Structure formats: C-alpha cells, structure tokens
Amino acid sequence: MRNSVEFSQLGLKTAFNLSQNKTYTSAVKKQFFSTGAFLSNGGNIDLNKHTQKNIDSKYVACNSRSVTPPNDVASSVSKNTLRHKQRLMMAQWLMSPEVQKAKSSSSGNVGLGPNTNQPFPLNPFFKPPRPISHSLRMKITDEYLQGASIEVLARKFNTSPQRIEALIKLRRINDEFEEKKKPILHSYNEVMEKMLNACTKPEMMQFNDGNDIPLRSNPVSLWKSLPEGETFTPQEAAKILKWPSIEELNMRQNATHFHKTSDEHKDLNEDEELISSSPSEVGKRVFRLIDLSTGNVYRRDTGGDIYVKRKKSTT
C-alpha cells in the first residue's frame, strides 16, 4: 500500500508518497519532518550544511532594499526535488530578518526600493514585466487613431502586436466610459503606477511577450480570413501580394528567349562567314573576339558555330 502524507503551513503544501521500500520511506520521513520542524520553529533549524552555509549569502541588509537572488538549483535533480527545494528557499526568505522587518514596518511603501526598476525588490521570486503608464498608453493609441498600423507601433515601441491590440481595446473602453460619464479612478491608477514603477517613456519599454516579435515593417496587413472549406489558389495569393502569376512569368521568359534568338539571327548578316562548326562546344553564351591586327570580328554562338566578319578594305 502507498500512503500519502500531506502537510500545509504558510501557504506551502508538500506531499510525499511512502512506498514499501524501507530505505526510501525512512528518507522521505526524515525529509518531511525536517521541513515541518523548520517551519514550526520559525525557520531556525539546520536543514543541511549547504543550505546553512549559503543562507547568509542570499540576503543583504534591509536598508539597501535589495536581495541577492537565491542560488540556482542543479538542473540534474528531479522535478519533485526541484519543487521541494524551491519551497524551502521560499520558506527561508519568508523567515528572513528583512522580511520580518518589512512586515512590522509602519511605512506603507514597503513594496518599493530606491533606485531600482523592479517592484517589490525584497522578493527575489517576483519578476513581472513592467506595466505601461496611462500617459504612454494614450500616446500609443493616439498614433493608432492617426493611422499608424499595429505592427508599426509594435516595432516602434519594442513590444508585441498583441499588446498593442490590448491597449487599443482599453482605449475604446476608456472612451466609452467617458461618453457615458462613468467615473474613472485616475487617482488609483497613479498610485499603482508608482508602486509598480510603470514605464512612462518609450525607451523604458522592454519586449517581454515571448517570441512573437514583429518582423515586417510593412504597414499593410496581409492576413486573409477564409471560411472553412473554401479554396485559396496561388493566383489569388499573387493578386493580393501584387506578384505576377506563374503563367505571366513563363510568358515573359518565353518572350525574352524569342527576342534573344531573333537577335542572334539578325547578327547572321551577309558580311559574316561561317568558318567552323563544332557541336561539342555548345555553350550558353555568345562570345565575340576582335583581331586587332586585321580588324576582323569573330563570333561563336551557343550552337558551337564560329563566324567571322571581315573588315572591309578602304581603297
């Protein structure tokens, strides 16, 4: 039988399955009760030498309002072990002196640190993207209303097209509220922007929406929605892209080849004389050579024939 032991404290939940193997069972029990003792005693118990050795290096003084990120867990451990160590690191951080001091502080501005762009700098596990301020959102949407496309704005402000679309939707809702004279909490917005250190300038924005980077600077959208089952031929795609169709390209190529052949026949005037023919020397180009001593012009065509145009004597 496999028994399940579940423990929950300080918002941390750990589950361990105990198997029939005595060695595995004793090891898991030891790990479980060490975790429980650590949390119940306020995080002062020694978990292991490595954790105790590095616990001082994970934190700095609260006056600087900055915490060194926790040590990286080895990538070779299993997922369950990784989650367990992450929970222990979070528990250690919750029991750290700087967090306890922040909890007991009477100041309401505990989520901000001086000279930092990260909100809640005391928490090394909190790394969200910076929001966009109301003034910058209005600037972006104003350019959209003036005719700028979504992709151009995404490239200009270093963000994704999806985020620009979301800002446009928010602008529409904001305009609807103003038309209906519904109250808008501008003061709350200003407070939250200060707390989260929102971006107020375009150069402060950082792309953080995955790999969906706008690659094209073409302001014309080339997306086309089709009903299910409807065919979309290459000819229709060529019309939308304003490209010539394959038939037109073939006609142009044939016409060019015809003109080249006609030009070659024009060169076969009465002044030229066939002096040599070699089918083994067939090529793709026509060569012309001039004999500077006599002034004669030699031409070898693509079929391997060599012609000469002798210079007329001026007597």
Swiss-Prot record:
One of its GO terms (biological process) is mitochondrial translation. Keywords: Mitochondrion, Ribonucleoprotein, Ribosomal protein, Transit peptide. GO terms for cellular component: mitochondrial small ribosomal subunit. The keyword Cell cycle does not apply. It holds the Pfam family Bot1p. It is found in: Mitochondrion. It comes from the Eukaryota. The keyword Transit peptide applies. One of its GO terms (molecular function) is structural constituent of ribosome. Residues 1-66 form a transit peptide. Its main location: mitochondrion. Component of the mitochondrial small ribosomal subunit (mt-SSU). Mature yeast 74S mitochondrial ribosomes consist of a small (37S) and a large (54S) subunit. The 37S small subunit contains a 15S ribosomal RNA (15S mt-rRNA) and at least 32 different proteins. The 54S large subunit contains a 21S rRNA (21S mt-rRNA) and at least 45 different proteins. Belongs to the mitochondrion-specific ribosomal protein mS45 family. Component of the mitochondrial ribosome (mitoribosome), a dedicated translation machinery responsible for the synthesis of mitochondrial genome-encoded proteins, including at least some of the essential transmembrane subunits of the mitochondrial respiratory chain. The mitoribosomes are attached to the mitochondrial inner membrane and translation products are cotranslationally integrated into the membrane. Required for mitochondrial protein synthesis. Has a role in mitochondrial integrity and cell respiration. This is Small ribosomal subunit protein mS45. It comes from Schizosaccharomyces pombe (strain 972 / ATCC 24843) (Fission yeast). The lineage of its organism: Eukaryota, Fungi, Dikarya, Ascomycota, Taphrinomycotina. The gene is bot1.
